[in-house]
Amino acid sequence: MYALLLGGLSTAYAQTGITPEVLKTLQGSYTGTPAEKAMRNAISNVGISKMAVNQENAGAKDKNFSIEVKNTGITDQKSSGRCWLFTGLNVLRGRAMKKLDTKNLVLSQCHLFFYDQLEKSNLFLQGVIDTRKQPIDSEMVRWLFQHPLSDGGTYTGVADLATKYGVIPADIMPETYVSNSTSEFCGHLKRKLREFGITLREKSEAGMGEKQLQALKVEQLGTVYRMLVMAYGVPPTRFTWKGKTYTPQEFFKAYCINEGEDLNRDYVMLMNDPSRPYNKVYEIDYDRHVYDGHNWLYVNLPIEELEEIAIASLKDSCQMYFSCDVGKFLDRNVGFADINNYDYGSLLGTTFGMNKKQRIETFDSGSTHAMTLMAVDLDDAGKARKWKVENSWGADSGQNGYIIMTDEWFREYMFRVVVNRRYCPASVLELMKQKPVRLPAWDPMFQNEE
């Protein structure tokens, strides 16, 4: 019976595999015309993107903006995935610079990243404890061990971490070699966390109770803390800066937020995700940095409404945390994002016709990078023509560290923007009262900005 089954499968595979006859048909799709040979030679020697540059769109770019928030200076995340942290701190430092009346201030990314990695380690280990009764091949447990932690993140991480641990100037806890190049150390930390996770599951299976597991977790976190100190340094509990002594929390409350302000409560994450119904609130499980913090919660809006809210914020000189699929159709040399920058279809003799909804559903596009939205250029009707963001790839990238994007590109590849509630119309604030639709951690929209 087994042999018959295998025989049946082999026949089915033979009918659907690439047979010699099918291969011969496929080979006929390339005829080797002089034009095809020339194109093949050019692509193989120069590369796709250089060959696909659309010369009809390669002229001078308009760099003028009708509304632009004063910049705070370009930072550089180097070889790390911390764009979310640089972006969030860039927004906060703009406020601090105004209150301190200074043009020279950078907030320490290394300080908050230390606690980010510590909190994410606890998030993973506690997740292992919470799911210890589930089989190790269950979807949730498998996801946990696949994603023990990363250096990427979202706005909620900035909000939770800054609120809990405060912020400090960068010269108090400067960058290290490891913070500028996180991949190797993160790999070692992930391996150690997986080892700790397996130990927790084995101890649970052997009869260890909740209280003892929590004690073991704290012991494991002690090892994590020591590893983090070796890589990033010791976070100060008090520091002296320009003649005054602060705790990180005191500095944060004094200069980065207004009295009574809450970075979670007072801000709304807006999303344009056409793969899901609009005017609903969504929450992604485990999309947070702190176990007792906030999941990523967003209201899904049509792009037209989202743009109106973003414009209102910029008109009031308020920058925003913004994220997008930055790599699509971006000319990195000039810092210009335009869907007409490259003509890949003509080059390769085909078309690329998926819309935004289809790209999300098939994992072809998603939010990959966070930047600070700081400018918009409006036409006579008050509609956006182009946008400008402050990036964190250093001053030598793009337009002296900035990226300009056409509104057409913005609509196709922009995903998230975080705005103060005061810029949202009453209809959007009413939507936020809904019970969120809970999405699993492995949803296509679970993607950290890096």
How should these model regions be labeled?
Residues T16-G73:
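N-terminal regions that are enriched for targeting/export leaders
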Residues L85, H111-F114, D160, P169-I172, ...:
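Structural recognition of the beta-strand scaffold that forms the well-ordered cores
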Residues M1-G17:
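Bacterial Sec-dependent N-terminal signal peptides
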Residues G59-D62, S66-T131:
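Post-signal peptide N-terminal segment of secreted/secretory-pathway proteins
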Residues V69-G81, W143-L149, D292-N300, I309-A310, ...:
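Second-shell loop/turn segments in exported
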Residues G17, G207-E450:
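Active-site signature of cysteine proteases
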